[in-house]
Regions:
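C-terminal helix-coil-helix/basic helical segment that borders enzyme active sites and/or dimer interfaces
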Residues: 36-37, 303-335, 348-349, 454-457
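A structural signal for short hydrophobic beta-strand segments in well-ordered beta-sheet cores
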Residues: 146-149
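Glycine-rich beta->alpha junctions and the first turn(s) of the following alpha-helix
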Residues: 206, 210-301, 370-379, 388-456
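N-terminal glycine-rich flavin-associated loop
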Residues: 92-112, 138-141, 276
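Amphipathic, small/basic residue-rich leader segments at the start of a protein or domain
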Residues: 1-96, 108-109, 113-123, 421-505
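A short, Trp-centered hydrophobic/proline-enriched beta-strand micro-motif
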Residues: 123-132
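A short core secondary-structure module
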Residues: 158-204
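Alpha-helix capping/hinge segments and adjacent helical runs
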Residues: 326-414, 481, 485, 491-493, ...
Length: 505
């Protein structure tokens, strides 16, 4: 009896769960099929999906009382990391399901609708996604036109959504809409509704699929919504719907490092492996100083992303309300996605011509990681918001000097000493947006340095910590120099006249 109990307990440990999942990925991508060839086509064969989903990976985001593993952030990030080491689109597929459907349902859905939904995820390999973006309202989600009204005991929802990951593939959706007011206007607040594609009245029509540039595994498209859902499928906000949306999106952004972790590690492993084997004269590529610098950049990204995962595991669980944690959520999402793109670019660069193939992990990685810098808030917008929120805090605290303020701010206090000389200036008010973007990048990197130091305190190896801090100091010094440049160059709309070089040759 004791032996059986021990066996069951071992089977339930995270390490065993992840090992089984990784084995399923190897079988699906290297034995059943060839991941490099699969990456040339859209979607995945049913047999490959079945092998992967047989391990019930999405159980990590389902509460234990419904048969899941407990919605533990550490486990969710470990799953995302394991998936992204082999396939970034697969990891994003799981990220959409976890952060944009299962976690919101766990936290905000009525109890009577949870059990059947979670059961289908556990036993029928169901999937879910989130619909916010509309053709005319991308980042301007608060002005969305999708609307709802009461229809007896139900809600009637109409509108148009697009660029939702898993378009036509998800079984469930969280659809965002604004209530119709008696005067014909739409309410300012936003509500979320669960839809079930198995119910005819709740089916969302796919008008067309898009030919997305990368992430071939994930279908995107244009959706027309004209559905009727029961009242109990409306999510219940703790205060306002907008704050619920912020909580959901901030949690999602804080879990981006899980998708970045395995991806960056794969770029690092591929780059080191290639440079170790590629001979130039009597030495391999690792003998070149420029190559050492490039690979150390990827290694710094690996360390920073590890620290972000460590931090996210402690703060982004569904028990916490993250609606007011915009600085931290934006900093994590924007910086880690920039690091993902840079790591892929560097891996391709050292791989030479072989990397310039969609069937090569680095070439594919550039195209697949690029949209991460755009969706869920473009990075320029997020960096701008970080800077604006920080300037507001500095104004409220009556501390104009950036270094002095960061030395007292809880997210940067531990790392501020490393940058005190570089950041010994007052940003001032009325910065141009391009300067706000630079300031946001600076702040996000100081926050990341604090994460790295916190991870070091828990035993992470010192040489990786030292290298990552050095690269962060270099990046911040470069960004500060940009702040001092009085660049006000703007685009010239009518640039053609007098600019044809042939006329002067």
């Amino acid at each position: 009896m004791t032996s059986l109990s021990t066996h069951i307990a071992n089977e339930n440990t995270l390490s065993v769960f992840i090992q089984r999942f990784e084995r399923a990925l190897r079988e699906a991508f290297y034995e059943q099929a060839d991941i490099n060839q699969l990456s040339l086509q859209r979607g995945l064969p049913a047999a490959v999906w079945t092998r992967i989903m047989n391990e019930v990976p999405l159980s990590v985001a389902i509460p234990t009382e419904y048969g899941g593993r407990g919605s533990i952030v550490k486990e969710c990030l470990a799953l995302l990391s394991a998936a992204s080491y082999e396939s970034l689109p697969l990891s994003l597929t799981f990220g959409i399901n976890i952060a944009l459907f299962l976690e919101p349902v766990s936290k905000y859905a009525n109890e009577q609708v949870k059990a059947p939904i979670f059961d289908r995820f556990l036993t029928q390999q169901s999937m879910g996604g989130l619909m916010i973006t509309e053709p005319d309202y991308g980042s301007d989600a608060l002005n969305m036109r999708t609307s709802y009204r009461t229809a007896g005991e139900d809600y009637r929802i109409t509108g148009t959504k697009h660029w939702q990951g898993l378009t036509g593939q998800a079984d469930f959706w969280l659809v965002t809409a604004r209530g119709q007011l008696p005067n014909g206007e739409l309410a300012r607040d936003i509500d979320f509704f669960i839809t079930d594609n198995a119910v005819p009245a709740q089916q969302i029509k796919v008008e067309r699929l898009y030919n997305n540039l990368g992430l071939y595994m994930i279908p995107y498209g244009l959706n027309t919504i004209d559905i009727q859902v029961p009242a109990q499928q409306r999510l219940v906000a703790e205060s306002t719907g907008i704050k619920m949306m912020l909580d959901i999106l901030h949690r999602s952004r804080m879990q981006f490092p899980g998708m970045g972790m395995g991806f960056i590690k794969r770029m690092l492993d591929e780059a080191i492996g290639h440079c170790s084997q590629r001979m130039v004269g009597s030495s391999n590529l690792l003998a070149l100083d420029s190559v050492q610098f490039q690979l150390s950049r990827i290694q710094a990204a690996y360390t920073i992303c590890s620290a972000m995962c460590h931090r996210s595991s402690h703060i982004s669980g569904i028990a916490n309300n993250l609606a007011m944690e915009g600085i931290e959520a934006n900093a994590m999402k924007a910086l880690v996605t920039d690091l993902m793109q840079e790591s892929a670019q560097l891996c391709l660069q050292v791989s030479g011509a072989n990397g310039y193939k969609i069937s090569h992990i680095a070439g594919r990685g550039i195209v697949d990681s690029r949209p991460f810098q755009i969706f869920e808030g473009s990075n320029e917008m997020l960096y701008t918001q970080i800077a604006e929120m920080m300037i507001k805090k500095m104004r409220k605290g009556k501390e104009p000097n950036l270094a002095a303020f960061l030395a007292t701010y809880d997210l940067t206090r531990d790392a501020s000493a490393y940058f005190k000389d570089t950041l010994d200036f007052a940003p001032g008010e009325g910065l141009m947006q391009r300067k706000l973007v630079d300031l946001g990048k600076i702040i996000s990197r100081v926050i990341a340095a604090s994460y790295v130091l916190a991870l070091a305190n828990d035993g992470f190896r010192d040489d990786l910590v030292t290298g990552s801090i050095e690269h962060l100091r270099r990046d911040i010094a470069h960004l500060v120099s940009n702040l001092y440049l009085d660049s006000r160059v703007k685009v010239i709309d009518d640039y053609v006249t007098g600019s044809d070089w042939l006329s002067f040759t």
